[in-house]
Amino acid sequence: MNWLCTTLIVCLTLNSEMNYTNNDEFIEDVRACTVHLNSMYSEHERVPVDLVIAQSIHESEWGRSRFAVEGNNLLGIRTFDPADDQLKPLNKPNASWGLRIFETKCESISYYIELLNYNHHYDDFREERLMQYSSDLVNLEKLASTLAIYAEDVYYTQKLIQTLKELNDYK
């Protein structure tokens, strides 16, 4: 996994601790990491920064969730591999899965970008992103609507779209 080694080096040098103390700093830290990581991809492979920010807000409660604090996991990334370092949900200590532990929060963003770019579950996301890139019209709500598979919650995309709207109002 050369991309991971490269990304880890980049992430470790890019605000590895993300020492945010408020929502504005959280947004700026996630933005800085995402912009830097996106620079390693061609334009049509980049994940929109505001989508990453909105999803990290939603998944990590503004970086304050247990999984974000203890596992540097800003995006609720699960693992089913018992060999991976992971945190189990407190209400499901015997779950067959856990939330993956990352060295840095930026590494979790890198993993998320790779997931969207290469995992077959996100083909619809990539197709929609390419159509939007080709037409020069970015519609984050439409992109978010392709991410239903990301979570078990049947209302996930609606919640993500609401977070995008709140983020836009927040700015």
Regions from the PLM with identified roles:
Residues N2-I53, H58-K171:
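Catalytic cores of secreted/periplasmic lytic hydrolases that degrade extracellular macromolecules
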